Protein backbone atom coordinates (compact mmCIF):
# COMPACT_ATOMS: atom_id res chain seq x y z
CA UNK A 1 0.00 0.00 0.00
CA UNK A 2 1.53 3.28 -1.01
CA UNK A 3 -1.42 5.51 -0.07
CA UNK A 4 -3.69 4.89 2.91
CA UNK A 5 -7.28 5.98 2.45
CA UNK A 6 -9.11 8.05 5.02
CA UNK A 7 -11.96 5.57 4.73
CA UNK A 8 -12.46 2.30 2.90
CA UNK A 9 -16.08 2.96 1.90
CA UNK A 10 -15.60 6.19 -0.04
CA UNK A 11 -18.64 7.39 -1.96
CA UNK A 12 -20.98 5.13 0.02
CA UNK A 13 -24.10 6.60 1.58
CA UNK A 14 -22.88 5.75 5.10
CA UNK A 15 -19.42 7.29 4.81
CA UNK A 16 -19.05 11.03 5.15
CA UNK A 17 -15.33 11.38 4.36
CA UNK A 18 -13.98 12.52 1.07
CA UNK A 19 -10.21 12.14 0.77
CA UNK A 20 -8.03 9.23 -0.27
CA UNK A 21 -5.14 10.01 2.06
CA UNK A 22 -5.12 11.25 5.63
CA UNK A 23 -2.32 11.53 8.15
CA UNK A 24 -3.89 9.54 10.97
CA UNK A 25 -4.27 6.43 8.80
CA UNK A 26 -0.50 6.43 8.23
CA UNK A 27 0.09 5.25 11.81
CA UNK A 28 0.36 1.54 11.02
CA UNK A 29 2.93 2.20 8.28
CA UNK A 30 5.01 4.25 10.72
CA UNK A 31 4.77 1.61 13.43
CA UNK A 32 5.77 -1.21 11.08
CA UNK A 33 8.79 0.63 9.66
CA UNK A 34 9.96 1.97 13.03
CA UNK A 35 9.34 -1.02 15.28
CA UNK A 36 9.17 -4.17 13.14
CA UNK A 37 11.82 -3.18 10.56
CA UNK A 38 13.45 -1.06 13.27
CA UNK A 39 14.39 2.01 11.19
CA UNK A 40 14.49 5.10 13.42
CA UNK A 41 16.43 8.35 13.84
CA UNK A 42 19.07 8.65 16.56
CA UNK A 43 19.37 12.43 16.12
CA UNK A 44 17.08 15.22 14.97
CA UNK A 45 16.53 15.31 11.24
CA UNK A 46 17.78 11.72 10.83
CA UNK A 47 21.40 12.96 11.03
CA UNK A 48 22.15 9.49 12.40
CA UNK A 49 20.00 6.37 12.33
CA UNK A 50 19.40 3.05 14.01
CA UNK A 51 18.18 -0.18 12.47
CA UNK A 52 17.04 -2.55 15.22
CA UNK A 53 14.43 -4.99 13.91
CA UNK A 54 12.01 -6.82 16.16
CA UNK A 55 11.51 -10.01 14.22
CA UNK A 56 9.33 -12.17 16.41
CA UNK A 57 8.25 -15.14 14.29
CA UNK A 58 8.47 -13.30 10.96
CA UNK A 59 10.56 -14.86 8.20
CA UNK A 60 10.94 -11.70 6.10
CA UNK A 61 10.70 -7.94 6.50
CA UNK A 62 11.13 -5.29 3.81
CA UNK A 63 10.83 -1.56 4.46
CA UNK A 64 12.13 1.81 3.39
CA UNK A 65 12.02 5.14 5.17
CA UNK A 66 12.72 8.54 3.61
CA UNK A 67 15.12 10.87 5.38
CA UNK A 68 16.71 14.18 4.32
CA UNK A 69 19.78 12.38 2.87
CA UNK A 70 17.68 9.87 0.86
CA UNK A 71 16.05 6.49 1.47
CA UNK A 72 17.04 4.00 4.15
CA UNK A 73 16.08 0.52 2.94
CA UNK A 74 16.01 -2.71 4.94
CA UNK A 75 15.45 -6.26 3.73
CA UNK A 76 15.52 -9.09 6.28
CA UNK A 77 15.34 -12.83 5.66
CA UNK A 78 15.15 -15.21 8.60
CA UNK A 79 15.39 -18.95 7.92
CA UNK A 80 16.44 -21.89 10.08
CA UNK A 81 19.81 -21.84 8.29
CA UNK A 82 20.66 -18.14 8.55
CA UNK A 83 19.59 -14.59 9.36
CA UNK A 84 20.27 -11.91 6.72
CA UNK A 85 19.87 -8.17 7.27
CA UNK A 86 20.56 -6.10 4.17
CA UNK A 87 20.50 -2.31 4.51
CA UNK A 88 20.98 0.46 1.97
CA UNK A 89 21.83 3.76 3.61
CA UNK A 90 22.67 7.09 1.94
CA UNK A 91 26.43 7.64 1.59
CA UNK A 92 27.81 9.81 4.38
CA UNK A 93 25.26 8.73 7.00
CA UNK A 94 26.48 7.17 10.23
CA UNK A 95 24.38 4.96 12.43
CA UNK A 96 23.92 1.75 14.38
CA UNK A 97 22.69 -1.54 12.97
CA UNK A 98 21.58 -4.12 15.51
CA UNK A 99 21.72 -7.82 14.68
CA UNK A 100 19.25 -9.76 16.82
CA UNK A 101 20.71 -12.52 18.95
CA UNK A 102 18.32 -15.33 18.12
CA UNK A 103 19.13 -17.62 21.06
CA UNK A 104 22.75 -18.85 20.87
CA UNK A 105 22.64 -19.93 17.27
CA UNK A 106 25.25 -18.05 15.24
CA UNK A 107 28.39 -19.94 14.31
CA UNK A 108 29.60 -16.75 12.61
CA UNK A 109 28.41 -13.37 11.38
CA UNK A 110 29.70 -11.73 8.23
CA UNK A 111 29.37 -8.15 7.07
CA UNK A 112 29.64 -7.63 3.32
CA UNK A 113 31.27 -11.06 3.08
CA UNK A 114 33.93 -10.49 5.78
CA UNK A 115 33.76 -12.53 9.00
CA UNK A 116 33.24 -10.12 11.91
CA UNK A 117 32.01 -12.47 14.63
CA UNK A 118 33.15 -16.06 15.21
CA UNK A 119 33.64 -18.34 18.21
CA UNK A 120 31.49 -15.90 20.22
CA UNK A 121 34.03 -13.09 19.68
CA UNK A 122 34.04 -9.90 17.60
CA UNK A 123 36.71 -9.64 14.91
CA UNK A 124 37.59 -6.04 14.06
CA UNK A 125 38.09 -6.64 10.34
CA UNK A 126 36.40 -3.63 8.74
CA UNK A 127 37.67 -0.07 9.39
CA UNK A 128 34.18 1.44 8.98
CA UNK A 129 32.47 -0.91 11.45
CA UNK A 130 32.76 -1.23 15.25
CA UNK A 131 30.96 -3.34 17.84
CA UNK A 132 29.36 -1.00 20.40
CA UNK A 133 27.67 -1.83 23.71
CA UNK A 134 24.31 -3.52 23.37
CA UNK A 135 22.24 -5.85 25.48
CA UNK A 136 21.46 -9.55 25.68
CA UNK A 137 19.10 -9.28 22.69
CA UNK A 138 21.27 -7.52 20.07
CA UNK A 139 24.80 -7.15 18.78
CA UNK A 140 25.09 -3.43 17.95
CA UNK A 141 27.43 -2.33 15.19
CA UNK A 142 28.35 1.30 14.58
CA UNK A 143 28.48 1.95 10.84
CA UNK A 144 30.67 4.93 9.97
CA UNK A 145 29.42 5.44 6.40
CA UNK A 146 26.41 4.56 4.30
CA UNK A 147 26.14 2.30 1.28
CA UNK A 148 24.98 -1.30 1.05
CA UNK A 149 25.60 -3.21 4.27
CA UNK A 150 24.76 -6.91 4.51
CA UNK A 151 24.96 -8.86 7.77
CA UNK A 152 24.61 -12.65 7.57
CA UNK A 153 24.37 -14.77 10.71
CA UNK A 154 25.00 -18.43 9.93
CA UNK A 155 23.33 -20.79 12.35
CA UNK A 156 25.25 -23.39 14.32
CA UNK A 157 23.00 -26.27 13.28
Predicted regions and their residues:
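Non-catalytic C-terminal accessory modules of carbohydrate-active enzymes
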Residues: 1-157
Amino acid sequence: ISTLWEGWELNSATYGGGTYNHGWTGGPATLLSQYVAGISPLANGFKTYKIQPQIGLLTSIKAQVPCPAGLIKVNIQNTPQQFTLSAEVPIGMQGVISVPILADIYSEITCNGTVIFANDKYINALPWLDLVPGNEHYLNFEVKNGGKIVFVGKNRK
